Regions:
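C-di-GMP signaling machinery
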Residues: 8, 14, 23-69, 79, ...
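Active-site core of bacterial EAL-family cyclic-dinucleotide phosphodiesterase domains
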Residues: 49-111, 148, 209
């Protein structure tokens, strides 16, 4: 693999060119085989932005999830018009140049998955959602909350144990929490879904498939699950 850069004024800016050369080589290797990558400034700017967000995410997770918030999107019964639940949505903001900047979930969630930080961050969301559900059930009997579960959580953590822990901590019935299983980022999640489905059935935890049909979840695989 080969990374190619156009080096002008190399001696004056050696450190910067060294970083760019390392970046270009990594890009070439990521292409597979004997890939050749020609340095693009926009690619490098995007890379630096991602590294900055990753650093902020690591800091937030180790600092009691400062910068993370959970928003709730109401779930409404169409027949009655009443609110019967909510979907928990993870949000993240960080300081950049002294100003608070909200980062799109499209940007930060893949980075959480890439770094494995989605596991502790996911537990944070679960706990926050369970606490909110406990409070809301005092006013709306039967209120439930939907929580998105990443494929990384399915593969690399005992997510069903995390869900049970949150349910038990707030003395909630199992049906009060519904896991939305997302499939993005992995092509064949069938074995993991099957195992998780069995665990959920045993513990009477509801689950649904999010973004149905965008990845592994064609009808053939659904039959297997």
């Amino acid at each position: 693999s080969t990374g190619i850069i156009h080096a002008t004024k190399l001696l004056k800016y050696y450190d910067e060119y060294r970083k760019i050369a390392v970046f270009s080589l990594k890009q070439a290797k990521s292409m597979g085989g004997n890939g050749v990558y020609f340095f693009e400034k926009e690619d490098y700017k995007l890379f630096l932005k991602k590294e900055k967000i990753k650093s902020a995410l690591r800091g937030a997770v180790t600092n009691e999830f400062e910068g993370f918030e959970v928003y709730y999107q109401p779930i409404i019964d169409c027949s009655s018009g009443n609110i019967i639940g909510a979907e928990a949505l993870m949000r993240f903001s960080m300081y950049s140049g002294g100003k608070k900047e909200s980062i799109s979930p499209v940007e930060f969630i893949p980075l959480l998955e890439e770094t494995g930080l989605i596991i502790p961050a996911g537990r944070f969301v679960l706990n926050e959602a369970a606490a909110m559900c406990h409070e809301m059930r005092q006013y709306i009997p039967g209120f439930k909350v939907n929580v998105n579960i990443s494929y990384i959580q399915m593969m690399k953590s005992d997510i069903w144990k995390d869900i049970l822990s949150s349910i038990e901590q707030y003395n909630l019935p199992p049906e009060s929490l519904c896991a939305e299983l997302t499939e993005s980022g992995y092509t064949d999640m069938t074995p993991y879904f099957y195992t998780l489905r069995k665990k959920f059935e045993e513990k009477k935890i509801q689950f649904i498939l999010d973004d149905f049909g965008t990845g592994f979840s064609n009808l053939h695989c659904i039959v297997k699950i």
